[in-house]
A protein has these predicted regions:
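Conserved glycine-rich Rossmann-like NAD(P)H-binding loop of the short-chain dehydrogenase/reductase
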Residues: 23-39
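C-terminal helical subdomain
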Residues: 177, 194-230
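The beta1-alpha1 cofactor-binding region of Rossmann-like NAD(H)/NADP(H)-dependent oxidoreductases
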Residues: 34-35, 56-68, 97
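Conserved glycine-rich cofactor-binding loop
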Residues: 9-10
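Substrate-binding pocket helix/loop in short-chain dehydrogenase/reductase
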Residues: 91-92, 99-104
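Active-site helix of classical SDR
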Residues: 115, 151
Length: 253
């Protein structure tokens, strides 16, 4: 059994890799930072020396690299974890457009391409799991993080649509979306925000995500508070949520 994880050098991606290693999966770890990837590999093999780990240094923010990654792997992948992603904080008219384009390419385009390519293979075998890492942000408008929230909404809607297509084919391929709230990862530093709300540990989120994914759960929402927030987002009008979200985001400055 083999799993491919993007964004595997830190945070949720790293900890999902660790959880899958404990379950005996061979791993292909993908990220930009080769030093961190080597450290993750070393740490995992210290505790799980009965598996194989391959590391690939790659930036998935370009379509060409995503296609090259698929061709380079050329392997029988049982689980795909699309975790690579980051956020940009600030007023939409003032945030850096080049950074936002990189965000869109990483959070949206890479997920789209890798899901399509590996899903085609999984459908031929009629088995496999795909976990797309979204966010609770994907269910609501997010002023002051407009591009990030919108990118996660894309992941949610894409995954929901694919799930229905798989259902109508009676496919055994399972697709899940992970929708956490604030998590203790490097995300805050990259997005240049300071979450005031209590964050879950990335280890807890990863363990919860893997358990639920392997059960075939579609919406994976860790934490009682975030489950409650998702319920509220279903019943409260978006304009009210946007006003509330702005006040919450403003406190992160």
């Amino acid at each position: 059994m083999k799993a491919l994880i993007t964004g595997a050098s830190s945070g949720i991606g790293r900890d999902i890799a660790t959880e899958l290693a404990k379950r005996g999966y061979d791993l292909i770890l993908v990220a930009r930072n080769i030093e961190k990837l080597n450290q993750v590999k070393e740490n995992i093999l210290t505790n799980c020396n009965n598996i194989n780990i391959k590391i690939i240094q790659m930036d998935v923010s370009t379509p060409e690299n995503c296609k090259n990654l698929y061709n380079q792997v050329n392997d029988d992948i049982d689980i795909l974890i699309n975790d690579a992603g980051f956020g940009v904080f600030g007023d939409f008219t003032k945030t850096d457009i080049d950074k936002e384009i990189q965000l869109i390419n990483t959070n949206i385009t890479a997920v789209h391409i890798l899901t399509k390519l590996f899903l085609q293979d999984m459908e031929k075998k009629n088995k496999g799991h795909i976990l797309n890492v979204a966010s609770i942000a994907g269910f609501m408008p997010g002023p002051l993080m407009a591009t990030y929230y919108s990118s996660k909404a894309y992941v949610v809607r894409l995954s929901e649509a694919i799930r229905e297509e798989l259902r109508r084919k009676n496919s055994n391929v399972k697709l899940s979306i992970l929708c956490p709230g604030p998590v203790n990862t490097n995300f805050n530093n990259v997005a240049d925000v300071n979450f005031k709300a209590k964050s879950l540990s990335s280890e807890y989120v990863a363990q919860y995500a893997v358990n639920e994914m392997l059960k075939g759960k579609f919406y994976i929402v860790p934490g009682a508070q975030i489950k409650c927030l998702r319920f509220i987002a279903k019943i409260v009008p978006n304009n009210i949520i946007a006003k509330f979200a702005y006040k919450v985001q403003e406190r992160k400055r």
